[in-house]
């Protein structure tokens, strides 16, 4: 079994925000496979799909971004999945809109959801798919309002394409493994 974990904040007020791009990819993956989310023990929503012979859980933590690690650990324990069988999908302020990077490990890079997962694991060795939300237009000192803000009209078309690419990358990870997905989906710009 594999887990595809999209990070974000619960609540309709966060729908469509830069910080919730992980939720958007999880939603796109579930919709692509006609799956729906159900609540699991209050910490996360999950949808289950089958990709070939592989069972896949799509997870959306309901603990808010800064406490994502609690939900990720709960889901991994429930499904009895190792760190090598997960990919975490999140926003990356340092990547331009229209780019994504899949990595086998690394630092949190300022992403508080990843930071909390690393703290809960005691390790940074887990796959993460970072999706660029761009910081070039961020007002000085406006970090929170920027990541919790919505994409511009111009960015929305790039994000729609990127969401589909990220969804397909997650599918590739589940079917063929991390190395294969990295070779096929790491981009400079789509």
Swiss-Prot record:
Keywords, alphabetical: Cytoplasm, Hydrolase, RNA-binding, tRNA-binding
Alphabetical list of SUPFAM superfamilies matching this protein: Peptidyl-tRNA hydrolase-like
A GO CC annotation given for this chain: cytoplasm
EC number(s) from the headed UniProt entry: 3.1.1.29
Top-rank lineage group of the source organism: Bacteria
Site, as annotated: Discriminates between blocked and unblocked aminoacyl-tRNA: 9
Compartments, as annotated in UniProt: Cytoplasm
First-tier enzyme category under EC: hydrolase
One GO term (biological process): rescue of stalled ribosome
Keyword Nucleotidyltransferase annotated: no
Active-site residues annotated for this sequence: 19
GO molecular function, one term: peptidyl-tRNA hydrolase activity
Catalytic activity annotation: an N-acyl-L-alpha-aminoacyl-tRNA + H2O = an N-acyl-L-amino acid + a tRNA + H(+)
Binding site for tRNA: 14, 64, 66, 112
Classification via InterPro entries: Pept_tRNA_hydro (IPR001328), Pept_tRNA_hydro_CS (IPR018171), Pept_tRNA_hydro_sf (IPR036416)
Site (Stabilizes the basic form of H active site to accept a proton): 91
Main location: cytoplasm
Database matches in Pfam families: Pept_tRNA_hydro
Function: Hydrolyzes ribosome-free peptidyl-tRNAs (with 1 or more amino acids incorporated), which drop off the ribosome during protein synthesis, or as a result of ribosome stalling. Catalyzes the release of premature peptidyl moieties from peptidyl-tRNA molecules trapped in stalled 50S ribosomal subunits, and thus maintains levels of free tRNAs and 50S ribosomes.
Family: Belongs to the PTH family.
Name of the protein in question: Peptidyl-tRNA hydrolase
Gene name tied to this protein: pth
């Amino acid at each position: 079994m594999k887990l595809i974990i999209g990070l974000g904040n619960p609540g309709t007020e966060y729908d469509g925000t830069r910080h919730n791009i992980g939720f958007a990819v999880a939603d796109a993956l579930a919709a692509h496979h006609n799956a729906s989310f159900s609540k699991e023990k209050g910490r996360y929503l999950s949808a289950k799909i089958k990709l070939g012979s592989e069972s896949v859980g799509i997870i959306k933590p309901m603990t808010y971004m800064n406490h994502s690690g609690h939900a990720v650990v709960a889901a991994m324990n429930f499904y009895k999945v190792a760190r090598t069988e997960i990919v975490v999908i999140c926003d990356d302020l340092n990547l331009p809109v229209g780019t994504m990077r899949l990595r086998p490990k690394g630092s949190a890079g300022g992403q508080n959801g990843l930071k909390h997962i690393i703290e809960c694991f005691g390790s940074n060795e887990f796959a993460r798919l970072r999706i660029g939300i761009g910081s070039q237009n961020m007002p000085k000192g406006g970090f929170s309002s920027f990541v919790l803000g919505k994409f511009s009209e111009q960015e929305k078309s790039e994000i729609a394409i990127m969401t589909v690419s990220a969804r397909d990358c997650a599918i590739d990870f589940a079917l063929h493994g991390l190395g294969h997905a990295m070779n096929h989906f790491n981009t400079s710009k789509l």
